[in-house]
A protein has these predicted regions:
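Short acidic/glycine-rich loop or secondary-structure boundary segments that cap or lie
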Residues: 146-149, 196-198, 209-214, 240-244
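Glycine-rich phosphate/pyrophosphate-binding beta-alpha loops
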Residues: 142, 146, 203-219, 286
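Gly/Ser/Thr-rich active-site loops/lids in small-molecule metabolic enzymes
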Residues: 155-167, 209-239
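Catalytic core of DAGKc-family lipid kinases
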Residues: 3, 13, 72-88, 92-201
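Reductase modules of NAD(P)H-dependent flavoproteins
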Residues: 42, 69-73
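ATP/nucleoside-binding phosphotransfer catalytic cores, i.e., glycine-rich phosphate-binding loops
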Residues: 190-191, 219-227, 234-316
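Short conserved active-site loop signatures built around small residues
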Residues: 40, 61, 122, 202
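ATP/NTP phosphate-donor binding region
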Residues: 1-58, 65, 311-316
Length: 316
């Protein structure tokens, strides 16, 4: 099944027709266009129920997240031994973080050929996913600053403005300056660790990189990957002077360290607790404001059509 979001930023009717024609020349293909939010979830769930071999999503990260959640049962009752269709991605959004992290070509037509080659060769791999009690995430979730940015960007898209790297950067800067005077904080709990008090923003990553500034990779948790647990990146300050050196390290891909920063690249569980609801985003979609939210990791949760990766050897 090919699920296409016709409203995604980088899709066009001609491009969609070309990649659908190319795929249908190689495989029996059911093409479905999404018409509303949540439709990719519904279509992927149908594909799982009807025993499709593979679901290919041509759209942005939001559509891919919906499809992944449709392919899998909710985390609270997921059966890891139950067969599910594999997930493949042809980039169609503005960021395409998940596809880029998997090693999929950013050009949709080249990505289509890449997916065909991988399917013909039987290439697939299992990846771990992060989740709350009722929802899976593919690459990142967060409370505080990044969720504020995502919320602001969604408002701008609804107002008819295109999501571009420059607009994301400007929205991030202005949101950061606005939030620097905010008193909203939350605490962070990781089993076996001291409680982190007064966090201002926190990222929970399922892989790295999970964010980009145009073509530049930003790695908040360099050692986190689909083969590890979750990465946690929590800052207890939004002060500009304290965060400028940290931002410089992130932009230069140096090891991100700071006195006001807690970082761990491999945990199985993390909980955020706030006195008042704070914005939360998941895979680049704003999901609401929460006081308490828990994130866990599930290894080998999803089969993806993607190039193989070399996992660094560990020494003991």
């Amino acid at each position: 099944m090919l699920i296409v979001n016709p409203f995604a930023t980088a899709t066009s009717p001609a491009g969609r027709d070309a990649l659908a024609h190319t795929l249908s020349a190689h495989f029996h293909l059911d093409v479905e266009l999404t018409t509303h939010r949540g439709h990719a979830f519904e279509l992927a769930a149908r594909a799982a129920a009807e025993d499709f071999d593979t679901v290919i999503v041509h759209g942005g990260d939001g559509s891919v997240n919906e499809a992944a959640n449709g392919l899998l049962d909710p985390p609270s009752r997921s059966d890891p031994d139950r067969g599910r269709p594999a997930l493949a991605v042809i980039p169609g959004g503005s960021a395409n973080v998940f596809a880029r992290t998997l090693g999929i070509d950013p050009d949709p037509l080249l990505a289509t050929q890449q997916i065909i080659t991988l399917l013909d060769a039987g290439e697939s791999r299992r990846i771990g996913l992060g989740h709350t009690d009722d929802r899976w995430f593919l690459f990142n979730t967060g409370m505080g600053m990044d969720a504020v940015v995502v919320h602001a960007m969604e408002d701008k898209r609804h107002a008819g403005k295109t999501a571009t790297p420059a607009r994301y950067l400007w929205t991030t800067i202005t949101s950061f300056l606005k939030q620097s005077g905010s008193s909203a904080t939350f605490d962070v709990e990781i089993p076996g660790r001291d409680r982190i008090i007064g966090a201002r923003f926190g990222f929970v990553s399922n892989t790295s990189p999970w964010t980009y500034l145009g073509p530049r990779e930003i790695r908040t948790n360099p050692d986190t990957g689909f083969h590890t647990g979750l990465g946690v990146f929590v800052a207890t300050s939004t002060g500009v002077l304290r965060n400028l050196p940290l931002a410089t390290k992130l932009l230069s891909q140096a090891d991100p360290k700071a006195r006001h920063l807690f970082r761990d690249d491999d945990v199985d569980e993390v909980c955020f607790h706030a006195e008042a609801p704070i914005d939360v985003q998941m895979d680049g979609d704003y999901i609401g404001a929460f006081r308490d939210i828990r994130f866990r990791h599930r290894r080998d949760a999803l089969t993806v059509i993607a190039p193989p990766i070399s996992i660094p050897e560990t020494t003991t």
